A protein has these predicted regions:
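Structural core segment of the AMP-binding/adenylate-forming
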Residues: 127, 131-215, 326, 333-334
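Conserved ATP/PPi-binding loop(s) of AMP-dependent carboxylate-activating enzymes
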Residues: 416-420, 431-466, 505, 602-603
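Conserved pre-ATP/AMP-binding loop-to-beta segment of ANL
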Residues: 68-70, 193-196, 206-238, 245, ...
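Gly/Ser/Thr-rich phosphate-binding loop
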Residues: 300, 328-329, 341-408, 422
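AMP-binding/adenylate-forming catalytic domain of the ANL superfamily
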Residues: 191, 195-197, 532-535, 564-589, ...
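AMP-binding/adenylate-forming catalytic core of the ANL superfamily
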Residues: 139-164, 179, 323, 330, ...
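Conserved AMP-binding/adenylate-forming core of the ANL superfamily
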Residues: 54-55, 72-127, 144-149, 205-215, ...
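Conserved AMP-binding/adenylation subdomain of ANL enzymes
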Residues: 257-275, 285-329, 342-348
Length: 622
């Protein structure tokens, strides 16, 4: 079946298409019902199927005689450590930690927060939750205490699994003090905290709440896989929304396993025994889908890399990993390639390593600018494939289906919509716009398997955030267009979520921190273009009347507050003091107009603006 046939079948007869795809995974009870639309718009896939995701990722490969195949390669330049786990070893460790969680009272449906760096134990903890039907919620290691506390209250975990520290190229980040602060701030109290001690920074243990990983494992008995319904949640992943309260994206077990298996074979062209490297973090959706679950479900070898594209030790770090481990396909964010290009513009490091095993480079997480695409294509001499998806979808919306039918690449486009995704560009009235014209990118319901069925304990917000604006469509929050060949072009967000180095951050959350400063009357944070990170936040503040504070001191205090309350990942560096913010007559801040002014673009002034002279002051300061 070629791409066009597969795509048309998926829209015309989704039950046949996804029913066939579902035969590629292992079921305890195969589904007889493929798509359940009885409670639309809450669609459910494989609603009467029963399976276990950990069994699909580990046990079935061991049972098939492939237990000695490498499952996970841990490569940590920051600790000078490397370790290979076979499928059998990873299964044993996962079963043991699953039993350890059971000994702490964790069972089917209970939540477990995982707050860890890029170490094998993070993967083991995720798979162990899946093994016993518990619901994991991974929080990016080193996220600020306040953000962690919000997620503790939202997920209400029985147990938190953490490590004593994470390791950056220039410093050790102690996690335990952040965890302790978060638990103190949160209203919900986790019953136990499991702490993996790392030699770089030992954590103080608070008994009886805290227990060390090694102590817990030493008395644990291995747990068997617990069968769960296909529609039971596998995990909740919190993503930045346009309000301070993060959205808990729910991933179900059945649709997730089916979609990820399909994507590995048909998009990424990776199968059993091949070496796959998603250079991301387990705290983000790419880490969930393509470091942990998808490569293991298809029986590939996945690489877990605790390092950076540059600085661990240099801009050749990625190419060293490719050579040393025989990587067949690499997936990272454009930011990583831009960082390497900045340090090594001529690509000298690329030529220092044997890259002959590498057949493709996949990029996603933010818009891929054509300059970066050309550089990577030229230096690596392999297809560089842009693709587009979201935390909410869990797997690509648009891609070049390399495993099915490689298509001509158009720089600046993530190619075409994948099966199950009926993508349209709509105008403000919900009408489809002609090819080449910008609109809100939306997906006609139902969404395919593997995408979010709802938000955690918040059906109303799921509807209001994604389904309300255009009847019968899911709102991606991105704007763009479709060309005459059906290729998609994604131009940017339509809301106040910005994309910093492939990480989604809410400007609203940053604004809340800045607005709390006693000298600030009001503020706005916008995302501005950055050569390396894609976007970085820039703050604009209006001072309270009579506020006597040095501008440089104010800037330092605000940058520090954002770093402490949100985390270094926020990357706020620039804060400008302005006399007023441009607003509509209804009081809405014109962020898009502000972005255009700051970036020097000539954009029409909205007719709804209250005071056009405010833009003049902004231009003189920009």
């Amino acid at each position: 079946m070629n791409y066009r046939q597969a795509y048309e079948l998926s829209l015309r007869d989704p039950e046949q298409f996804w029913g066939d795809a579902a035969t590629r995974i292992t079921w305890r009870k195969p589904p007889s019902k493929i798509l359940d639309d009885t409670e639309a718009p809450f669609y459910r896939w494989f609603s009467d199927g029963v399976l276990n995701t950990c069994e699909n990722a580990l046990d079935r490969h061991v049972s098939a005689g492939n237990g000695q195949r490498p499952a996970l390669i841990y490569d940590s330049p920051v600790t000078s450590t490397q370790r290979i786990y076979t499928y059998e070893e990873l299964r044993q460790q996962t079963a043991l930690f699953a039993g350890a969680l059971q000994s702490l009272g964790v069972g089917k449906g209970d939540r477990v927060i995982i707050y860890m760096p890029m170490i094998p134990e993070a993967v083991i903890a995720m798979l162990a939750c899946a093994r016993i039907g518990a619901v994991h919620s991974v929080v990016f290691g080193g996220f600020a205490a306040r953000e962690l506390a919000i997620r503790i209250d939202a997920a209400r975990p029985k147990v938190v699994v953490s490590a004593s520290c994470g390791i950056e190229p220039t410093r050790v980040v102690e996690y335990k003090p952040l965890l302790d602060q978060a638990v103190d701030m949160a209203e919900h109290r986790p019953e136990r905290c499991v702490i993996l001690q790392r030699p770089e920074a030992e954590a103080a243990i608070q008994e009886p709440r805290d227990i060390e990983w090694t102590t817990l494992m030493s008395s644990a008995s291995p747990a068997d896989c617990v069968p769960v319904a296909a529609t039971d949640p596998l995990y909740v992943l919190y993503t930045s929304g346009t309000t301070a309260k993060p959205k808990g994206v729910v991933r179900d077990n059945g649709g997730h396993a089916v979609a990820l298996h399909w994507s590995m074979e048909n998009i990424y062209d990776i199968g059993p025994g091949e070496v796959w490297w998603a250079a991301s973090d387990v705290g983000w959706v790419v880490g969930h889908s393509y470091i942990v679950y998808a490569p293991l479900i298809v029986g590939a070898t996945t690489i877990l890399y605790e390092g950076k594209p540059v600085g661990t030790p240099d801009a050749g770090a990625f190419w060293r990993v490719v050579e040393q481990h025989g990587v067949n396909s690499l997936f990272t964010a454009p930011t990583a390639i831009r960082a390497i290009k900045k340090e090594d513009p001529d690509g000298k490091f690329v030529g220092s390593f044997d890259m002959s095993t590498l057949k493709t480079l996949f990029l996603a997480g933010e818009r891929l600018d054509p300059d970066t695409w050309h550089w990577a294509t030229d230096k690596l001499a392999v297809p560089v494939i842009d693709h587009w998806w979201q935390t909410e979808t869990g797997w690509p919306i648009a891609a070049n289906p390399y495993g099915m039918e490689p298509m001509p690449i158009k720089p600046g486009s993530p190619t075409v919509a994948m099966p199950g995704y009926d993508v349209r560009a709509l105008d403000d009235q919900g009408h489809e716009v002609p090819p080449g014209k910008e609109g809100a990118l939306c997906i006609k319901l139902p969404l395919p398997p593997g995408t979010l069925p709802t938000l955690w304990q918040d059906d109303d917000r799921f509807v209001s955030a994604y389904l309300e604006q255009f009847d019968g469509f899911y709102l991606t929050g991105d704007e763009g267009h479709v060309d005459e060949d059906g290729y998609l072009y994604v131009m940017g967000r339509t809301d106040d979520v910005i994309n910093v180095a492939g990480h989604r951050l809410s400007t609203g959350t940053m604004e809340a921190v800045i607005a709390a400063h006693p000298a600030v009357a009001e503020c706005a944070v916008i995302g501005v273009n950055d050569d390396v990170k894609g976007q970085v936040p820039r703050g604009f503040v209006v001072l309270k009347a009579g506020a006597a504070i040095d501008t440089d001191r104010l800037r330092e205090e605000l940058v520090r507050s954002v770093r402490e309350q949100i985390g270094a990942i926020a990357s706020l560096r620039e804060v400008d003091v302005v006399p007023a913010l441009p607003k509509t007559r209804s009081g809405k801040i014109l962020r898009r107009t502000m972005r255009a002014v700051v970036e020097g673009r000539d954009e029409p002034v909205p007719s709804t603006i209250e005071d056009p002279s405010v833009l003049t002051a902004l231009r003189s300061g920009a």
